[in-house]
Amino acid sequence: MTLLDVAARLAQGRFRLDAKFVAPGDGITALFGPSGSGKSTLLSVLAGLKRCDGYVRLGARALADSGSHLHLAPHRRGIGVVFQDARLFPHLTARANIAYAWKRAPEKARPDICDVARFFDITAQLDRPVGNLSGGEKSRVALARAVAGAPDFLLLDEPFAALDGARRRAFIQVLLAMHETYRLPMMVVTHDIDDAAMLASHLVALNEGRVVAFGPFADVSLQPEFRRLLDDRDAGVAMPARHLRTVRGGQSLWLRADQVLLATERPRAISARNVLQGEVRAVTAEASGGMLIELSTPEGIILSRVTPDAVADLGLVAGCKAWALIKAHPL
């Protein structure tokens, strides 16, 4: 079911936003693009913080429609927003910040604040001023406040931009658990392909203010318009996590071409934990001098980057059988 239907245009100085896409009413959608592509501007349009030409629809409701001069205020849209910097009320406690949204939610839809606090593991912080909280605690309070408002759709703008390593991975798991527990459709803004793959079942790709691709993540990851947004080192595909051993949680893994080795005979007695048989669909020379091999497997398309010598030595041509070897450590 389509929940979010957008055809929005906006001019800001020399920048032009022209975004047309739909997002499903379930799952998590990643809004992906390089820095400066217009992701935060589009998020502001969806939230009602900026006016646009065109329309924004949420289910059967029109949130904005320039043709009928309609522009619903942010608090009437049923959309929750979590910004990079949390934007909590600094003079209030964590509990009061959460209660602010809770009081404005439809009475029948209001969750129990204590239950929400337990879910986000902030019970001990509820009565502390938010100025005394750590960055991670503030992020969890911001998520709790968003959930307490009982939105129909949640927007998150680079929610882990300030996190790295274990804290980043832990926060991704919190978002996945939040989506599963509250059945809350979400759109997450990110420029990191690994984060997008771990979180999202669908993808909207934005470049220079224009949506260049949208749809199921695995499908979009194979589209040339999307591939052009990636650096050479990020070239790869979204592989559903259920197809790979040693992967825990998440929607998919972004499997880079450099992480995949190829063999033309079935490997035996090897340390690689994931071996997938397939057929070579295409062999493409890259400007960097490498060769990109597209392998079709029962689990989906896989890309591997090899040298021209390897292509010649292994006899890699379209139609030949090959085995993809994926080491455990990149997973």
Model-found features: residue ranges?
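Conserved ABC ATPase signature
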Residues: 129-133, 137
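A short, proline-enriched helix->beta-strand linker immediately N-terminal to the Walker B motif
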Residues: 148-152
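Conserved ABC ATPase "signature" region
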Residues: 61-65, 110-125, 176-177
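Catalytic Walker B motif of ABC-type/P-loop ATPase nucleotide-binding domains
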Residues: 154-158
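ABC ATPase NBD coupling module
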Residues: 63-80, 104
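Internal alpha/beta loop-helix hairpins
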Residues: 176, 180, 190-248, 257-258
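Glycine/charge-rich catalytic "coupling/switch" loops of P-loop NTPases
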Residues: 238, 243-284, 301, 305-331
